[in-house]
Structure formats: structure tokens, C-alpha cells
Design a protein with these regions (language model features):
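Loop/turn segments within WD40 beta-propeller blades
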Residues: 24-30, 66-71, 108-114, 170-175, ...
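A short beta-strand motif characteristic of beta-propeller blades
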Residues: 8-13, 51-55, 92-97, 153-159, ...
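Loop/turn-rich, solvent-exposed surfaces of beta-rich toroidal or solenoidal domains
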Residues: 160-192
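WD40-repeat beta-propellers
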Residues: 1-3, 42-46, 83-87, 125-130, ...
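Conserved strand-to-loop turn within each blade of WD40 beta-propeller repeats
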Residues: 35-39, 70, 77-80, 119-122, ...
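WD40/WD-repeat beta-propeller blade N-cap
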Residues: 14-20, 56-62, 98-104, 146-148, ...
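Short loop/turn segments immediately following beta-strands, especially the blade-tip
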Residues: 129-146, 191-195
Length: 206
């Protein structure tokens, strides 16, 4: 951790046994945040503590995380190709978002707190409904198809292939656009309009 005013390191936090892939902060601004790692764990931290205050164990590398708007859930993506909504009060999986065919590389909650965008190494960007009472396939339901009733849209129009892997997706401040960076040095941008599918409207190259 660094002091943003002085640029000096404030604190070094230890606890993970593998590469740390992502960090997510709660929107409450209370100094609580979580970290995801290749060691298969998500650790929870308080800014005033040097050591984790809680953890979630998954047993496989976790690549991305994001808190729900009220911080009651943590969305977790990893190498199992799924996004799991973990209830932080019970530590149980509330539901899973199924559809990606490869590792989930990033998660981002809309500013309204109702939509989650995910990017994956399957060359897809997906938008999900994460409102509390949206329809969902239960995480443990036998024979459930590999998709989720919460999937709103799959955004298309980007390049595909190993050199074009999608790394990070984010919402614009007004939730009207979705942008995703790619390994081929390009930024793909979509105009997101509810109920009206749209392809990539432009691509920026660095």
C-alpha cells in the first residue's frame, strides 16, 4: 500500500502464497478490500491491519474479483470458466454465472450496481444481471445447462486468437459504454443499450 499524497509505501501486506491477480475495494470506502491469487484463495483485508482478516478457499487459481454494490456478495472468476457469487455472511455460493468457455479474465460492476461485465480468454465479453431477484440457475443444480438465465448479452465484433486475448473490461462512468483492452494493443469499445444488442463500435490501437 502507498500513500497517494507522498508516494511513499505505507504498508506491505503478506498472506498469499502465489501471484496476486486482482484487488477489489468495497464501494463504502471503509478501508476494506479483497485480493485474489493463483494460490486459490481470496483474502480480505482491513487497511489498518497487516494480515488478512478473513479468507475464501477455492482450490484453483482465482483471476478476478468484484464486490456487489452493497458488499454483501463477492463475484469471483477463475480458471474454472465460471463466475461465482459468494455470500460473504455465510461464505456459501449464492449462484453461478455460466457461459464463458475459458478463464474469466476480468469483472466490473456497473456504476448503477445492477450489471456485471466480464471478459474471458474465450474471446468474449458478457454482460450479466446481478440484481438480487433476477432469475438464475442454482450453482449445484444437477444437469443445469452451461449458461445462466442472468446473461443479458454477449458483446461481439472483436478480433480473436491468442494474440488478441481480452484482458480487462470496464464500464464508462454513465454505464453507456463498455471498453475492453486486448493483448494485441487495441481497446475495443461497445455502446451498451439495454435490450438492443450492439457490436463493437470502434477499436483504438496503441
Amino acid at each position: 500500500m502507498w500513500n497517494t499524497l507522498t508516494g511513499e509505501r505505507y504498508r506491505r501486506l503478506r498472506g498469499h502464497r502465489g501471484i496476486i491477480n486482482d484487488i477489489a475495494c468495497t464501494r463504502a470506502g471503509n478501508g476494506c478490500f479483497a485480493s485474489a491469487s493463483d494460490d486459490g484463495r481470496v483474502l480480505f483485508w482491513d487497511a489498518e491491519s497487516r494480515y488478512p482478516v478473513d479468507s475464501l478457499e477455492f482450490g484453483y487459481p482465482i483471476t478476478c474479483i468484484e464486490f456487489s454494490d452493497d458488499a454483501s456478495l463477492l463475484f469471483v472468476g477463475g480458471v474454472d470458466n465460471a463466475i461465482h457469487a459468494m455470500d460473504l455472511a455465510t461464505k456459501n455460493r449464492q449462484y453461478s454465472l455460466l457461459g464463458h468457455k475459458d478463464t474469466v479474465s476480468s469483472l466490473a460492476l456497473s456504476h448503477a450496481g445492477t450489471r456485471l461485465v466480464s471478459s474471458g480468454l474465450d474471446d468474449s465479453v458478457r454482460v450479466w444481471d446481478v440484481q438480487p431477484f433476477a432469475a438464475a440457475i442454482p450453482a449445484q443444480q444437477p444437469g443445469a445447462p452451461q449458461k445462466s438465465a442472468r446473461l443479458i448479452r454477449t458483446l461481439d465484433g472483436m478480433a480473436s486468437g491468442f494474440e488478441s486475448l481480452l484482458i480487462k473490461a470496464r464500464w464508462s462512468p454513465d454505464d453507456e459504454f463498455v471498453a475492453c483492452g486486448s493483448a494485441d494493443h487495441t481497446l475495443n469499445v461497445w455502446k451498451y443499450v439495454n435490450k438492443h444488442p450492439s457490436g463493437c463500435i470502434f477499436r483504438l490501437t496503441v
